[in-house]
A protein has these predicted regions:
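Short, well-structured secondary-structure segments
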Residues: 39-53, 60-79, 103-105
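Hydrophobic faces of well-ordered beta-strands that scaffold small-molecule active sites
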Residues: 17-21, 41-43, 70-74, 104-106, ...
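Acidic-and-aromatic substrate-binding clefts and catalytic sites of carbohydrate-active enzymes
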Residues: 18-29, 45-56, 77-86, 112-116, ...
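Conserved, mostly hydrophobic/aromatic
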Residues: 19, 33, 63, 106, ...
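Acidic (Asp/Glu)-rich catalytic clusters
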Residues: 28-37, 55-68, 91-100, 175-177
Length: 182
């Protein structure tokens, strides 16, 4: 039986607020983000075709300017180990030694990857992780609840996870998701 009251819960589990950003959101007013009190930003670094997100440079620079701790994510379209290694190398190249306070998140949600099976996804994720950590960056896996429960194998659950849990009720905010590290 859980006997936590609200105050105990808040004391035990620190709430942090963050956003994930890509070119889909357009040009962000980072001063407003900082004034709103965001604790972190996770920026998309590359998009389909291994092309650098057109707003990555600006977003990274503005996060540093406003002291917003930063991480990056790579939505993977890879279907082979060679492809995911290429994606990882592109991430490292695009980062070019930049400092990150949060991990490089491998975004595993591409529906075509499901057909590869859990074991192949496991091998691909570890191939990506080796390149990222060899470059000195922290690594984690981003996915939605469905992928975490039904696609990700237990071998990968040793890594940090950022799990998207999209809000069911519209509170007037758009493109809002709650991420938790498991």
């Amino acid at each position: 039986m859980n006997t936590d009251n609200k105050e105990d819960f808040q004391e035990r589990y620190m709430e942090i607020r963050g956003i994930d950003i890509s070119a889909w959101q357009g040009q962000i007013d980072w001063k407003t983000v900082a004034d709103y009190g965001m604790d972190f930003a996770i920026l998309r670094i590359t998009e389909s075709g291994n092309v650098i997100d057109k707003y990555f440079e600006r977003n990274y620079t503005e996060c540093q300017k406003y002291n917003i701790p930063t991480g990056v994510y790579k939505y993977s379209y890879a279907m082979t180990i060679a492809e995911i290694q290429s994606e990882a190398r592109k991430v490292v190249s695009a980062l070019n030694g930049r400092e990150l306070q949060y991990p490089v998140w491998l975004d595993l949600e591409y529906n075509n990857q499901r057909s590869l099976g859990a074991e192949n996804i496991h091998k691909m994720a570890e191939a990506f992780e080796k390149i990222i950590t060899a470059a000195g960056y922290k690594f984690g896996i981003y996915c939605n609840v469905d992928w975490y429960m039904n696609v990700i194998c237990s071998h990968l659950k040793k890594y940090d996870f950022w799990i998207a849990r999209h809000l069911a009720n519209d509170d007037g905010c758009r493109n809002v998701s709650v991420q938790t590290s498991v």
